[in-house]
UniProtKB/Swiss-Prot annotation:
Binds 1 Fe(2+) ion per subunit. This is PKHD-type hydroxylase BRADO4652. One of its GO terms (biological process) is DNA damage response. 2-oxoglutarate binds at R171. Keywords: Dioxygenase, Iron, Metal-binding, Oxidoreductase, Vitamin C. Its EC number is 1.14.11.-. Gene3D superfamilies: q2cbj1_9rhob like domain, Rabenosyn, Rab binding domain. Residues 78-180 form the Fe2OG dioxygenase domain.
Amino acid sequence: MLICIPDVLSKDEVAEFRRIMDAAEWEDGRSTAGAQSAMVKRNEQLPPDGEAARLLGQRVITALTKNPRFLSAAIPLQIFPPLFNRYTSSRGDHFGIHVDNAVRGDPLTGLRIRTDLSMTLFLAEPDTYDGGELVIEDTYGSHEVKLPAGHAVLYPSSSLHMVTPVTRGARVASFFWMQSMIRDAHVRSMIFDLDTTIQSLTERFGRDDPDAVKLTGIYHNLIRQWAEV
């Protein structure tokens, strides 16, 4: 399940993020990579323990917890503190094909999560850089993702993925992982489809529509059956 989530941040918020990030110090992105990923990773990151990363990361989480599409698709239990990276053409930055670590731990908070879902939140407009596509592989093939600034993509952490070399400009983004209440990706996808259908019925016929009410009951009973909290 690959889901695009528009307007997580407004254009003004993106501009403010970029001002803070441009004024911050950056470090080698391999510092947060696993052993396999570090061999194919070339980019820069904001230090995870730095003031900029912590401030902006909390603002990303706040925005997501107000986003109905994200909450419906992810059904999040824990969100890992967002990280921030930059791929520049001057260094030929890229991130080769890899899969994310199954478990992530944050040494600053002690948080440990199972990585069910990965998210990239784009912070540079696509016409300001060439290359830098996020390529995600699944059973249906490869999917290239390059979204407007402020938009995000959510995808299974079990997916092989890569970032193609940046050949002009700079690709700037936030990336992070989350543990869902619903461990099984197939079940999570079906529940998301059900929730989307309920929302559509409610918009068309109102919250008191008998079919919408019945399906809402089914939705909550499925969550009750499958949720790990």
